[in-house]
Design a protein with these regions (language model features):
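Bacterial N-terminal signal peptides that target proteins for export
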Residues: 1-9
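Intrinsically disordered, low-complexity peptide-like regions
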Residues: 4-5, 22, 118, 222
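Solvent-exposed helix/loop surface patches that form functional interfaces
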Residues: 116-194
C-alpha cells in the first residue's frame, strides 16, 4: 500500500509539473505569470481500480493542496506547494483501518513539507525541485525517489513558444533514462478568461523495482488567461497503467 501511495504522489508531482464569449480565430501566446503571494487551492480527487492478491479493489484518494507563487526573477516563478490534507478509502473497513495508520504517518510528515519548484513563462519547470521542511533523511529520500519526476517535467514542454489559436494542436515529447512520454495537446476553446486544452498521450516509466510501467492518459484542463495558472476544478483525466500484466485504472480531477 505504501508503494501505491508513492505512485500516487509521483503522479501528483508529475501531473503536478496542468468563460465567456468565444474568440474564434484569435491567436494567443501562453504565459505563466501568476500573482505573487496569492495562494491557489486545489482539491485533488482520484478513484483507482486495481487487483490486489486476486481481489478487485477500488480506492478513493482526496488531497487538498495549496500552490503559492512566492518570487519571480528573469521570468522564472518560484512555486511553493503544500499538502493541507489527505485521506484514502477502499470501502473495506479492515483495509481502511490498516491504511489509516499509514495515512496518519504521511499526514504528519507532509504537514511541514513545502515542495519548491521553478516555472518559466512557458509553464515548464526548470532546475531542481526541492523538498523543504522535512527531516534530512526524508528530504534525501524524496530527492532520490522523485528525481525522475523533476527531470521528466523539465524536458516535457506543455505549451509551444509560437502563437496558437482555437483548434490548433501541438506535441510534447521527452525521452530519458527514467521516462519516455509522447503527448498531443489541442486548444479547444479560447474565451476572455480561459484557455481550454485537451490532451492525450502515452508514458513509459522505466527502471522501477516493480518493472516497466506503461501509462496512457487522456483529459482536459482550463488555464486562467491572465495568470497562466490551472483553474481549480477544471483538470480531469483518465489514466491506465500496466506493469507485469497488472492494470491500474484511475480517474482524476483537480
Amino acid at each position: 500500500m505504501k508503494r501505491f501511495l508513492h505512485f500516487l504522489l509521483f503522479s501528483f508531482c508529475l501531473l503536478a509539473a496542468i468563460a465567456c464569449g468565444k474568440k474564434n480565430g484569435e491567436k494567443i501566446t501562453y504565459r505563466f505569470v501568476p500573482e505573487l503571494n496569492k495562494p491557489v487551492v486545489y482539491n485533488f480527487k482520484s478513484t483507482t481500480e486495481m487487483n490486489v492478491g486476486g481481489k478487485d479493489v477500488s480506492m478513493q484518494m482526496v488531497m487538498k493542496m495549496q500552490m503559492t507563487p512566492t518570487a519571480r526573477e528573469n521570468g522564472v516563478t518560484t512555486i511553493s506547494t503544500q499538502i493541507l490534507d489527505m485521506s484514502a478509502s477502499t470501502g473495506n473497513e479492515e483495509a481502511d483501518r490498516s491504511m489509516e495508520q499509514s495515512m496518519q504517518q504521511f499526514k504528519q510528515l507532509f504537514s511541514t513539507l513545502h515542495i519548491i519548484t521553478q516555472v518559466n513563462e512557458r509553464g515548464n519547470t526548470v532546475g531542481k525541485t526541492s523538498y523543504e521542511g522535512l527531516p534530512k533523511e526524508y528530504a534525501a529520500m524524496f530527492q532520490s525517489q522523485m528525481g525522475g519526476s523533476t527531470d521528466f517535467s523539465n524536458n516535457l514542454k506543455y505549451f509551444p513558444e509560437y502563437p496558437i489559436g482555437q483548434g490548433d494542436s501541438w506535441t510534447g515529447k521527452t525521452h530519458g533514462d527514467k521516462a519516455d512520454c509522447d503527448a498531443t495537446y489541442t486548444l479547444e476553446e479560447v474565451t476572455n478568461d480561459a484557455l481550454t486544452v485537451s490532451f492525450k498521450g502515452k508514458m513509459t516509466l522505466k527502471n522501477n523495482p516493480q518493472g516497466t510501467i506503461h501509462i496512457t492518459v487522456e483529459g482536459s484542463c482550463q488555464y486562467n488567461r491572465k495568470t497562466g495558472m490551472n483553474i481549480p476544478g477544471t483538470f480531469k483525466a483518465e489514466t491506465k497503467a500496466t506493469s507485469a500484466g497488472q492494470q491500474v485504472k484511475s480517474t482524476v480531477s483537480m
